[in-house]
Amino acid sequence: MQGPGGNVSRGLPSGPASTVASGAGRCESGALMHSFGIFLQGLLGVVAFSTLMLKRFREPKHERRPWRIWFLDTSKQAIGMLFIHFANVYLADLTEEDPCSLYLINFLLDATVGMLLIYVGVRAVGVLVEWQQWESLRFGEYGDPLQCGAWVGQCALYIVIMIFEKSVVFIVLLILQWKKVALLNPIENPDLKLAIVMLIVPFFVNAFMFWVVDNFLMRKGKTKAKLEERGANQDSRNGSKVRYRRAASHEESESEILISADDEMEESDAEEDLRRPVKKKHRFGLPV
């Protein structure tokens, strides 16, 4: 009787001990949405989004966007990034592997392959919008006065681009079997794994992604060449020549200001009238 009793006493702790050992240092399924994980995600969102505010203040004063335009531009990107983030969290919990490692791999693929896909998508949409002359769907242009419908349409287009990007990245993840890669296995502390996956690595990568994607989505200033071409086409009918000057301040509505040939001739005539009395005084030896 002692034998069976001893066997039972030795067998009872062995099960729980092995369970604890197998789970030690592992990022369990659902850990990304636990309280600590949610706290890290919120902190990351605030810190990473603040880089867009820094970018705005670093823009030249005559090109700096008003706060309302800046908010409309960046809110589209924030919605797109939230979609990618929660898609990664959902996909990470679909596997029996370490969800923290799979989330990190997903995130790094979004920051490399995904960035290229976003750029291609934005350019393709831009070409389509120009071809169809959909004025309200040009990224960064919301009409004057601002139209909420323009923002909604652009936001919908950007979400379609993000769905395309995430679908391609997910296919790449499945084909290359990267879901079996355990990048964080050497780290034993699960909270440290969460901090690396949700805060440390994403902070630097998200700051770079926000900065670059904002350049994709913001309204580009009209170039001098485009304005000259447009002005030449307009004024060729009138037979007049035009020239352009750079805007001296942000208050002027366009970064390139058209000056008509008539205005330039009036300025030159006024200067010539001022020089004539001076020339006559020099001719007769009178003091100027």
From Swiss-Prot:
Residues in compartment: Cytoplasmic: 1-28, 215-288
Transmembrane segments: 29-49, 69-89, 102-122, 156-176, 194-214
Subcellular location, record wording: Endoplasmic reticulum membrane
GO MF entry, a single one: calcium channel regulator activity
Amino acid composition bias (Basic residues), ranges on this chain: 277-288
Disulfide bonds, paired cysteine numbers: none
Coiled-coil ranges (or none): none
Tissue: Widely expressed.
PANTHER family: STORE-OPERATED CALCIUM ENTRY REGULATOR STIMATE, VACUOLAR MEMBRANE PROTEIN YPL162C
Function: Acts as a regulator of store-operated Ca(2+) entry (SOCE) at junctional sites that connect the endoplasmic reticulum (ER) and plasma membrane (PM), called ER-plasma membrane (ER-PM) junction or cortical ER. SOCE is a Ca(2+) influx following depletion of intracellular Ca(2+) stores. Acts by interacting with STIM1, promoting STIM1 conformational switch. Involved in STIM1 relocalization to ER-PM junctions. Contributes to the maintenance and reorganization of store-dependent ER-PM junctions.
Subunit structure: Homooligomer. Interacts with STIM1.
Protein name: Store-operated calcium entry regulator STIMATE
Organism for this UniProt entry: Mus musculus (Mouse)
Gene this chain is encoded by: Stimate
